[in-house]
Swiss-Prot record:
Residues 230-317, 325-412, 474-555 form the PDZ domain. The gene is dlg1. This is Disks large homolog 1. Residues 4-64 form the L27 domain. One of its GO terms (molecular function) is ionotropic glutamate receptor binding. It comes from Danio rerio.
């Protein structure tokens, strides 16, 4: 049946009559929904769409050849003039098949991550030209879209007409929009701005029948550790309002292919409902099972779920807490504990709380004995620490008198409510060990209870050696970004493998069950009692995400081993011993090249006598090749001198975990990354980050136009008359195709501006590089990793300002507040992308910095370069 304007007018009258009747029933939600639908009916866009539909069906498809004039006149007689709708329409810049947003503020949607650069994607200089604005015009709609117009449900900005047929459902306040999937590093994460309408209250939570939902074999823990819930969401203007990650092709946590909630968007449908949480695992969307599907299939299931979406989720049971007050008196080492967490710097995903991550031996907290690792700080004196930033929490703890009152929430169960919590030890230790270990081994005997955990009321630091059990203990660790978080030594002549160092904040440290001097007996059932160092390292490296370790505390054996190593070191340093005699033997000789992630000067670190200096020292040229210009993220000299007068309140910042320690001496030291030498046949792209990067980029291209160039970006906007495809832009006809290419990681960075996509493709960068020019890229730090994945290793140079005054001196147009913000952004940038920088430069003047950048690019141009490898140390 053809859709005619008189039918739309009649529907509008019926809706208005129904709205009038509703004013007496007191249902504000339904009245608001109907009011929004009425506004859509009154919009000029809807009028234009109905006009097009009627023209198409009545005029173009009329087999009786009725005069167009009659149809047109009838249309205008049966439909009121535009000005009676009392709506204003903004200018349209929409091309074919792109509808125009009506009466909605223009917002910006980004594909890129939250980098330091939040400006709109440039069109060489400015993509927005006021002269291009055009008056309202009739939108061209394809035949496919026209055939669907009878079910238009509404409209929001940045959307396409993508209507859904929903029987017996009142049209919603907003229309479907195409989901915008951000460019993401592995694992992929998708924001669920997935379209659809409907106005219906969400029912109460329903517990899913757990018998019908089989447990995923990849998820740690027993059924007793989890709870299940059905959550029904109604799509809002921004879709469902959450982000997901995971899938069989891109596991989010270890090898677990489940689909996890990674972000709840403030103000979205999920946030308003209040039941969905970060780290929830989606088992089913309506009737579609998404437990063992690819990431794209999960996204598709959410897109096609309709306007009312039922999510069946699984989550770990919440942790019960005990609130207590703790009084501390500051000592020489201050309060004596470290913290992590806060808004924007979550220690546990989805949790903004401030957590204690380390108790410093000899400090006030250690002597008091009540605070433990994993305790949550709720308040300090009269200052609330809930929902505050990490910096605010640090400031509150620093600005305290000698007597400090802390309000603390102590967990009453062993593991915290996070996705990395290990499974229950008693239930997971079955036949696994016995299947791999001889029955004669004492490993098959019942294990003694492990030492007190990080949540035990007994402080581990207060236990003496005599109080620690010497029997085999079972420890379950979950590998993190820093690996397992400990170092091993030993493996010579069957003397055993010992733990020599535990990384602060790493999985081993947070577990609290391992200590220096532990002998590793087995890893995942592999007997290491007689293993060489290489065999032990291989067993740990290949143990997977969940690692089960049997360890024994053997401090006496470890002390003897340390003494042996000390004697060997003294012999090597005090005599000219030839390579191989008197040194530790390894069963397999191997050369390993590493890059220092800090400012390294070998002449200051190692003392060589006159006989061995000529063999062991590195000349300047080779040192520059092996060790990149990377600097430790620490306080400068001035700030260090200022803090010495109040050393008990000195705060050091851990660059890897934003963990603040209330101590006076120790700093977190970055380690090494494994590298390999590679020959490149192209000119490496150049990415300069930090203050004054635009000036440096412009100067490089101006001074060396034959060595530096820029690539041609892509866009979905229509080509202007004076533009040339391939010179000004690569004009993409299909927005869907560009969105697909973005999802397929063919772009190093992309964004949206004025409803059009802009992006820099890997292929565009490669074309410039293969022509023998360094491609200058004005992109964020995330693009460095994406280029590396594409085998285009960029020269990434970070301009590190010395101070706020240094920035103001180089750019006199900046006000002091602007300079401070620029400095803070630079520090955050360094902290986030330090390991990806090729070099860091500093200088008092722009000219000095520019000369350093030119020298670095010349040195790093190849043809032989050092590139990071996936292999961990």
């Amino acid at each position: 049946m053809p859709v005619r304007q008189k039918d739309a007018q009649r529907a509008l009258q019926l809706l208005e009559e129904y709205q009038t009747k509703l004013s007496q029933t007191g249902d504000p939600h339904l009245r608001l929904s109907i009011e929004r639908v009425i506004n859509i009916f009154k919009s000029t866009l809807f009028q234009a769409l109905v006009d097009i539909q009627e023209y198409y069906e009545v005029s173009l498809q009329d087999t009786e050849d009725k005069p167009i004039e009659d149809s047109s006149l009838k249309s205008r007689e049966s439909f009121p003039p535009v000005n009676e709708w009392n709506l204003s329409v903004p200018p349209s810049t929409t091309g074919p098949t792109e509808p125009v947003p009506i009466n909605l503020p223009q917002t910006e949607e980004k594909y890129r991550y939250q980098d330091e650069d939040t400006t709109s994607p440039p069109e060489h200089s400015s993509p927005h030209i006021p002269g291009d604005a055009r008056p309202p015009e009739l939108v061209q709609v394809s035949e496919k879209n026209i055939s669907q117009i009878e079910n238009v449900h509404g409209y929001v900005s940045h959307s396409h007409i993508s209507p859904m047929k929903q029987a017996d459902v009142i049209p919603p306040p907003s229309a479907p929009i195409i989901p915008v999937i951000p460019i993401s590093p592995v694992p992929a994460e998708t924001t669920a701005i997935i379209p659809a309408p409907a106005s219906q209250a969400s029912p109460a939570p329903v517990v899913v029948n757990t018998e019908s939902l089989d447990s995923s074999p990849y998820v740690n823990g027993t059924e007793a550790d989890y709870e299940y819930e059905e959550i029904t969401l109604e799509r809002g203007n921004s879709g469902l309002g959450f982000s997901i990650a995971g899938g069989t092709d891109n596991p989010h946590i270890g090898e677990d292919p489940s689909i996890f909630i990674t972000k709840i968007i403030p103000g979205g449908a999920a946030a308003q409902d209040g039941r969905l949480r970060v780290n929830d695992c989606i088992l089913r969307v309506n009737d579609v099972d998404v437990r063992d599907v690819t990431h794209s299939n999960a996204v598709e299931a959410l897109k096609e779920a309709g306007c009312i979406v039922r999510l069946y989720v699984r989550r770990r049971k919440p942790l019960s807490e005990k609130i207590m007050d703790v009084k501390l008196v500051k000592g020489p080492k201050g309060l004596g504990f470290s913290i992590a967490g806060g808004v924007g710097n979550q220690h546990i995903p989805g949790d903004n709380s401030i957590y204690i991550t380390k108790i410093i031996e000899g400090g006030a907290a250690h002597k008091d004995g009540r605070l433990q690792i994993g305790d949550k700080l709720l308040a300090v004196n009269a200052v609330c620490l809930e929902e505050v930033t990490h910096e605010d929490a640090v400031a509150a703890l620093k600005n305290t008198p000698d007597v400090v009152y802390l309000k603390v929430a102590k967990p009453t169960s062993v593991f915290m409510n996070d996705s990395y919590a290990p499974p229950d030890v008693t239930s997971s230790y079955s036949q696994h060990m016995e299947n791999h270990i001889s029955t004669q081994s004492y490993l098959s005997q019942p294990l003694t209870p492990a030492t007190p955990s990080r949540y035990s009321p007994v402080s581990k630091g207060m236990l003496g050696d005599d109080e620690i059990t010497r029997e085999p203990r079972k420890i379950v660790l979950h590998r993190g970004t820093t690996g397992l978080g400990f170092n091993i030594v030993g493996g010579e002549d069957g003397e055993g493998i010992f733990i020599s160092f535990i990384l602060a904040g790493g999985p081993a440290d947070l577990c609290g069950e391992l200590r220096k001097g532990d002998r590793i007996v087995s890893v995942n059932g592999v007997d290491l009692r007689s293993a060489t160092h290489e065999q032990a390292a291989a067993a740990l490296k290949n143990a997977g995400q969940t690692v089960t370790i049997i360890a024994q505390y053997r401090p006496e054996e470890y002390s003897r081993f340390e003494a042996k190593i000390h004697d060997l070191r003294e012999q090597m340093m005090n005599s000219s011993i030839s390579s191989g005699s008197g040194s530790l033997r390894t069963s397999q000789k191997r050369t390993l090249y590493v890059r220092a992630l800090f400012d390294y000067d070998i002449t200051k670190t190692v003392k060589f006598n006159s006989k061995s200096r000529d063999k062991a020292s590195l000349n300047d040229k080779r040192r520059k090749t092996l060790f990149s210009r990377k600097f430790l993220f620490s306080k400068n000299k001035d700030s260090g001198e200022q803090d010495t007068s109040d050393v008990d309140q000195h705060v050091t910042s851990n660059a890897s975990d934003s963990e603040s320690s209330f101590r006076g001496q120790e700093d977190y030291v970055l380690s090494y990354e494994t590298v390999t030498q590679q020959e490149v046949s192209y000119s490496r792209p150049v990415i300069i980050l930090g203050p004054m990067k635009d000036r440096i980029n412009d100067d490089l291209i101006s001074e060396f136009p034959d060595k530096f160039g820029s690539c041609v970006p892509h866009t979905t906007r229509p080509k202007r008359d004076y533009e040339v495809d391939g010179r000004d832009y690569h004009f993409v006809n299909s927005r869907e195709q560009m969105e697909k290419d973005i999802q397929d990681h063919k772009f190093i960075e992309a964004g949206q501006y004025n409803n059009h996509l802009y992006g820099t493709s890997v292929q565009s960068v490669r074309e410039v590089a293969e022509k023998g020019k360094h491609c200058i890229l004005d992109v964020s730090g995330n693009a460095i990793k994406r280029l590396q994945l594409a085998q285009l290793y960029p020269i990434a140079v970070f301009i590190k300002p010395k101070s706020v005054e240094n920035i103001l001196e180089m750019n006199k147009r900046l006000m002091e507040e602007q300079g401070r913000k620029t400095y803070d952004r630079a520090m955050k940038l360094e902290q986030e992308f330090l390991e990806h920088f090729t070099a860091i430069v500093q200088g008092d003047t722009l000219e000095e910095i520019y000369n350093q950048v030119k020298q670095i690019i010349e040195e790093q141009s190849g043809p032989f370069i050092w590139v990071p490898v996936k292999e961990k140390l």
